[in-house]
Amino acid sequence: MDGLLTSNAKKAQELLKEAGYDGTPVVLMHSTDLKVLTNLAPVAKSLMEKAGFKVDMQSMDWQSVVARRAKKDPPNAGGWNAFLTAWVAADVMNPVSTAYLNAACEKALFGWPCDAQLEKLRDDFAREVDPAKQKAIAEAVQLRAIETTPEIPVGEYVQPVAMRKNVKGFVIAPAPVFWNIELTK
């Protein structure tokens, strides 16, 4: 999959023109109160503008993003076009658990992507028991997701973990777990 997600503003501009984009502003919701998300929207806005979009970045707290993202109204009536969020590794470990790969139309998450082929691939992955075949299906899911863009992964980060020397038994996991912990003297 090397090279599939390489940034190319000139090519993006050409594709946008070819698609018939008319310059209608794209409403990008910008969460301002969660540190992990705060800087993402301004970067996305810059990249989208380099691609040729007119972007209306609207800043709000996360609770407002959460409430608004459930609205299906058009952007000029209080709706939206894009927002950024983050997931822990356990939520995106495979095509079935990755909620934003759900392309089941009205049953999908916010944005309501609708793609029967992507849904079939996710079902195939869930039913397959051979790890080698699952891997091939997962790669097909990734390629289809790039074609249909139900989500656009923008990166990964490692959340630092620190604790005092007297904390023992902490389990390093994809998400914080607080069992098996004890304090020693």
Per-range role (PLM):
Residues 28, 48, 69, 99, ...:
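Hydrophobic, well-ordered secondary-structure elements that form the walls
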Residues 1-10, 71-76, 97-127, 156-185:
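Short, solvent-exposed loop/beta-turn-alpha elements that line the ligand-binding surface or hinge
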Residues 9, 13-24, 65-78:
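Accessory recognition modules or surfaces
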Residues 1-15, 34-39:
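Structural transition elements
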Residues 19-35, 76-86, 129-165:
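Bilobed periplasmic-binding protein-like "clamshell/Venus-flytrap" ligand-binding domains
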Residues 47-102, 137-138:
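Periplasmic binding protein-like
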Residues 36-39, 67-68, 92-95, 163-165:
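Extracytoplasmic/secreted cell-surface and envelope-processing proteins
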Residues 10, 38-51:
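Short, polar/charged alpha-helical segment
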